[in-house]
């Protein structure tokens, strides 16, 4: 064997050793397929539930030589004011996803405890549990995408955290508040209930934030990624009672929010910008209504599901054909065909009116 082949063999052995050194559950892990990771040569991106246009803020550019605060106090205060809670109820995180991970790491013993979630729903609950070595239990939503409370009650053994999403991603519907209340009652003293409200700005009256004062095991996930149009900022929040926030604070990284992110988040939460966000949200909801009506008359579209978020779930005669045809035209949607109970379904982020019109015209041409 010459030196070159010997070097290649040794290199391959090194790679194999690095892989086998990783935890077994990580070796077997199928990572979350984010919209950007799925790629595509898109010109119209409607697959990540992002806001279609970017806000304009100016960085202050100061104190970049210093580590940030453990919790950016101006952001904490501003979000507490916005959400109508005390600063003691707020923890700022790197996006809503970090809040999900923190809660799992804080409350679940690896290989012993489990989380429970209700598919079809957001995929990061399962991925975050798997990376932490925590078991997952699933209780599918009912045919109308509501909680199956009797089955949840039957599967609570060893469950430390229950995740629900309202409005639910990818279906877009709200969970019944009465069901969330029942869930809180059957889990009291047993598990943390996490209500993911990433899309709540599109239906603020449906928030369960009023339940915080009576349920110490309730945690709410929020984000600036959706209605605030700051997905690139990576800024989210956990809202909960002070005892729960204090426990999470033990686990969170010492400097989680970079100074520039905190700067922009504080600007985004000023009353003047909140008013702008609310006005733009109404414009987007108008686009959603237009898109839903336009899709309903297309021969390829069998159903447009009711949505309270910034996206629509549609069922097609041939979802794969529709998805592929639009992909090839640079219109990138989110294929849901492999998701539980969502065969031939596609999720479409509501974009600008021009983008919505192009989606409708493109689907109209699919045979």
From Swiss-Prot:
InterPro entries: Aminotrans_II_pyridoxalP_BS, Aminotransferase_I/II_large, HisP_aminotrans, PyrdxlP-dep_Trfase, PyrdxlP-dep_Trfase_major, PyrdxlP-dep_Trfase_small. It comes from the Bacteria. Homodimer. Keywords: Amino-acid biosynthesis, Aminotransferase, Histidine biosynthesis, Pyridoxal phosphate, Transferase. Its EC number is 2.6.1.9. GO terms for molecular function: histidinol-phosphate transaminase activity; pyridoxal phosphate binding. Gene3D superfamilies: Aspartate Aminotransferase, domain 1 (3.90.1150.10), Type I PLP-dependent aspartate aminotransferase-like (Major domain) (3.40.640.10). This is Histidinol-phosphate aminotransferase 1. Belongs to the class-II pyridoxal-phosphate-dependent aminotransferase family. Histidinol-phosphate aminotransferase subfamily. It catalyses: L-histidinol phosphate + 2-oxoglutarate = 3-(imidazol-4-yl)-2-oxopropyl phosphate + L-glutamate. SUPFAM superfamilies: PLP-dependent transferases (SSF53383). Disulfide bonds: none annotated. Its cofactor is pyridoxal 5'-phosphate. Pfam families: Aminotran_1_2. The modification N6-(pyridoxal phosphate)lysine is found at residue 226. It comes from Haemophilus influenzae (strain ATCC 51907 / DSM 11121 / KW20 / Rd). PANTHER family: HISTIDINOL-PHOSPHATE AMINOTRANSFERASE, HISTIDINOL-PHOSPHATE AMINOTRANSFERASE-RELATED. Pathway: Amino-acid biosynthesis; L-histidine biosynthesis; L-histidine from 5-phospho-alpha-D-ribose 1-diphosphate: step 7/9. One of its GO terms (biological process) is L-histidine biosynthetic process.
């Amino acid at each position: 064997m010459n030196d070159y082949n010997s070097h290649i063999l040794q290199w391959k052995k090194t790679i194999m050793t690095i892989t086998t050194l990783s935890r077994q559950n990580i070796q077997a892990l199928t990572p979350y397929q984010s919209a950007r990771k799925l790629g595509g040569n898109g010109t119209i991106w409607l697959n990540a539930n992002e806001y279609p246009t970017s806000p304009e803020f100016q960085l202050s550019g100061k104190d970049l030589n210093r580590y940030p605060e453990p919790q950016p106090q101006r952001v904490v205060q501003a979000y507490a004011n916005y959400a109508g809670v005390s600063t003691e109820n707020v923890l700022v995180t790197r996006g809503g996803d970090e809040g999900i991970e923190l809660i799992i790491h804080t409350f679940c013993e690896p290989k012993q405890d489990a989380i429970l979630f209700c598919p079809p729903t957001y995929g990061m609950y399962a991925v975050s549990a798997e990376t932490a070595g925590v078991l997952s239990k699933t209780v599918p939503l009912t045919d109308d995408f509501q909680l199956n409370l009797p089955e949840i009650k039957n599967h609570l053994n060893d469950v430390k955290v229950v995740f629900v999403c309202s409005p639910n991603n990818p279906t877009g519907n709200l969970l019944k508040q009465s069901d969330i209340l029942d869930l809180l009652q059957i889990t009291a003293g047993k598990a943390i209930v996490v209500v993911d409200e990433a899309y709540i700005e599109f239906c603020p009256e449906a928030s369960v934030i009023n339940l915080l004062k009576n349920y110490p095991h309730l945690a709410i996930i929020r984000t600036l990624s959706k209605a605030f149009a700051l997905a690139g900022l990576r800024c989210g929040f956990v809202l909960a009672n002070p005892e729960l926030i204090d426990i999470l604070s033990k686990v969170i990284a010492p400097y989680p929010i970079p100074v520039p992110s905190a700067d922009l988040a504080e600007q985004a939460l000023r009353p003047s910008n909140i008013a702008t966000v609310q006005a733009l949200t109404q414009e987007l909801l108008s686009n959603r209504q237009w898109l839903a009506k336009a899709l309903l008359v297309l021969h390829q579209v069998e159903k447009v599901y009711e949505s309270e978020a910034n996206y629509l779930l549609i069922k097609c005669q041939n979802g794969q054909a529709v998805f592929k045809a639009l992909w090839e035209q640079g219109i990138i949607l989110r294929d849901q065909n492999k998701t539980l109970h969502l065969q031939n379904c596609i999720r479409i982020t509501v974009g600008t009116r021009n983008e919505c019109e192009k989606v409708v015209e493109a689907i109209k041409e699919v045979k």
